[in-house]
């Protein structure tokens, strides 16, 4: 009673095809496949090959964001909490 038979799943599939159509389902499938591929590529090892330079986006802060060096230059009496961890 808790599990569905093959006939239940076929009826659900038939209703989904009738509602969305085969073209829309194909587009959804290709979009989902592209998203999964992008996710897998993103989850691969973050190291870059030796011949490829590292990305410079991490070195440049976004406009309007204050870096640690700028913050310490503005107020030398502040303490960097991240630097005071027990090692």
UniProtKB/Swiss-Prot annotation:
The keyword Membrane applies. It is a single-pass membrane protein. It comes from the Bacteria. One of its GO terms (molecular function) is protein transmembrane transporter activity. Coiled coil: none annotated. Residues 46-64 have a biased composition (Low complexity). GO terms for cellular component: TAT protein transport complex. Residues 40-87 are annotated as: Disordered. It is found in: Cell inner membrane. Keywords: Cell inner membrane, Cell membrane, Membrane, Protein transport, Translocation, Transmembrane, Transmembrane helix, Transport. InterPro entries: TatA/B/E (IPR003369), TatA/E (IPR006312). The chain crosses the membrane at residues 1-21. GO terms for biological process: protein transport by the Tat complex. The Tat system comprises two distinct complexes: a TatABC complex, containing multiple copies of TatA, TatB and TatC subunits, and a separate TatA complex, containing only TatA subunits. Substrates initially bind to the TatABC complex, which probably triggers association of the separate TatA complex to form the active translocon. Belongs to the TatA/E family. Part of the twin-arginine translocation (Tat) system that transports large folded proteins containing a characteristic twin-arginine motif in their signal peptide across membranes. TatA could form the protein-conducting channel of the Tat system. This is Sec-independent protein translocase protein TatA. It comes from Paracidovorax citrulli (strain AAC00-1). The gene is tatA.
């Amino acid at each position: 009673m808790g599990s569905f038979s093959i006939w239940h799943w076929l009826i659900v599939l038939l209703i989904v095809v009738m509602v969305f159509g085969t073209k829309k389902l194909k587009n959804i499938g290709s979009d989902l496949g592209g998203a999964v591929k992008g996710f897998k590529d993103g989850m691969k090892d973050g190291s870059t090959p030796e011949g490829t330079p590292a990305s410079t986006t991490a070195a440049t802060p976004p406009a309007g964001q204050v870096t640690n060096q700028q913050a310490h230059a503005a107020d030398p009496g502040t303490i960097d909490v991240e630097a005071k961890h027990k090692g």
